[in-house]
Amino acid sequence: MKTVLHLLNTNTYSGAENVAITVVRAMKKLYPDYRLVYVSPDGPIRERLNSEGVEFEPIEKISRKEVRRVIKKYHPALIHAHDFTASIVSAYSTLRVPVISHIHNNTPWLKRFCINSVVYGLSTLRYKKVLGVSPSVFDEFIFGRFIRRKSEVIGNPIDLERIRDAAESAEDKRGYDIVFLGRLNEAKNPLMFLEIIAELKKRRELKAVMIGDGEMRAEVEAKILELGLGDTVELLGFVSNPHGILASSKVLLMTSSWEGYGLVAAEALALGKPVVATPVGGIPTIINGGEGVLVSEVPEFVGALESLLTDEDKYCEASRLAVKRAEKIDNLGEYAEKINRFYSGE
């Protein structure tokens, strides 16, 4: 049996973690000769991994010492490292074990000549393969032209059955008009979300929810008070299974400054929810019709949301198209086949 370590730098559940768990589950089901171990710092992610039946090896932090300890324990045939930190540490921890670097977002420093881009660029010499969730990951990487032979756009695994089962089994099924689902960080631009809600509140009553945690939580809490949104926006923090709330709500609002793929948009479509989002990263490959709206400015967001929330016929049509679009991007079997090809060295 071939052991593959999925290495991540975070201890909570969000986009990259979702992808890693989906890959592990799919590979276990379709290619049972693999032993797949999820390796990350311990924390809230443990509960999610237990519920998904994913083998977990907790580490103190991402470091060469800890990665080498885990390698010695499991003797892996391959390390599948998710995002930049895990990839770089893996590259400099072992010369013996092949590493696949899987990049889930196109952070702004990718475009610049800086210490981060140089360190990651040098680390790519060690990778067996570099996977990106959208073309923008490689198009915007300042050293992207040097890794063309080993880079491949793979998108994200979309498992409609798993998404819908998660929504059905969720304990929390409270419904809201508008949902923010993601980390509270610069990439997801949560302050813009609040500005949009404040403007929309001037036109109609509504209830919004923010699901997720992160380094901007204090700023978000302060902004909610500043804009007088205490009775309008509920800040839930990390929720281990947010799909029940998403399924019971009306619209997903994504205000991201940058994205890799935008997996939560696909999850919303799977649950029949229209998406209003910024046209960044892979989002335009997911939302390309009446199932959602792509806009960039606060007034445009407000107009699109007001239209969906007040026009029942328009909302129902967008919901129908969301389900239809989700069926087209359901790709779990095809995705697992690609991963198996990479693991097998083909």
Go through each PLM region and give its residues.
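Short hydrophobic beta-strand element within catalytic cores of glycosyltransferases
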Residues: Y38, P274-A277
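Carbohydrate-associated surface elements
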Residues: S136, P157
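A conserved mid-protein helix/loop that constitutes part of the nucleotide-sugar donor-binding site
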Residues: S14-R25, F180-R204, M210, E215-E221, ...
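A charged, aromatic-enriched C-terminal amphipathic alpha-helix characteristic of glycosyltransferases
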Residues: G15, D313-S344
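N-terminal strand-loop element at the rim of the active site
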Residues: H6-I62
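Conserved acidic donor-binding segment of nucleotide-sugar-dependent glycosyltransferases
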Residues: G289-P299, S307-E312
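Aromatic "clamp/platform" in nucleotide-sugar-dependent glycosyltransferases that forms part
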Residues: F238, S257
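Short His-centered aromatic/hydrophobic patch
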Residues: A81-S87, I103
